[in-house]
């Protein structure tokens, strides 16, 4: 299925007026926050080249970021930091970040399209009326837009804030994912204050 407004149009036909797409980025890395974005696009919106952010090059994501912001009726970006991820769990952190993004929209959303197969964790859940769509970032235009905003925003935070704070870990190169280089830096320096300790079991087991 190509990325389109099928789900948005279906929700509007059911009587909802402000339909947002929601996605998150950074659930898998060993450090830093998880980010989420919510985007409301106008009816009939077209954004050439937009797809699931994971299927796009970094250059393409960067180019589309301002286009999405300009075309959106409303958008918002939120995050939950590594301390809260460790204190709760990554699923709850993802849900909290997504609901925070929805709540921060300049226009209140009355319906949300959520990427994934879950809408709640142990300590957080999506409270806005919604539907969950497996592979939504490759099907819904507004979810795809949210995936780009979340991914680019997190990458910028890692590169512009965390990498200068902890240059020895070379966060800008791997964005915190469990790459060979990242594990080598962990072996050499141990965890930083921004590492998710609950995510380091694999590293600890191989020491």
Tell where the protein language model's regions lie, with residue ranges.
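RNase H-like, Mg2+-dependent phosphodiesterase core
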Residues: 1-207
């Amino acid at each position: 299925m190509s990325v389109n407004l099928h789900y948005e149009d279906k929700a509007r036909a059911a009587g909802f007026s402000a339909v947002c797409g929601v996605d998150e980025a950074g659930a898998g890395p060993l450090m830093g926050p998880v980010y989420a974005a919510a985007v409301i696009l106008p009816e009939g919106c077209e954004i050439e080249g937009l797809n699931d952010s994971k299927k796009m090059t970094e250059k393409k994501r960067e180019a589309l970021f301002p286009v999405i912001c300009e075309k959106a009726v409303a958008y918002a970006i939120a995050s939950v930091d590594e301390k809260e991820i460790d204190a709760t769990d990554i699923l709850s952190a993802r849900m909290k970040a997504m609901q925070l993004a929805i709540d921060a929209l300049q226009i209140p959303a009355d319906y949300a399209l959520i990427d994934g197969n879950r809408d709640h964790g142990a300590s957080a859940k999506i409270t806005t009326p919604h539907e969950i769509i497996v592979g939504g970032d490759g099907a819904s235009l507004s979810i795809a837009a949210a995936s780009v905003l979340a991914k680019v925003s997190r990458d910028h935070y890692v590169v512009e804030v965390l990498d200068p704070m902890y240059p020895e870990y070379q966060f800008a190169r791997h964005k915190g994912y469990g790459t060979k280089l990242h594990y080598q830096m962990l072996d050499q320096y141990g965890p930083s204050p921004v590492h998710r300790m609950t995510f380091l079991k694999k590293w600890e087991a191989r020491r």
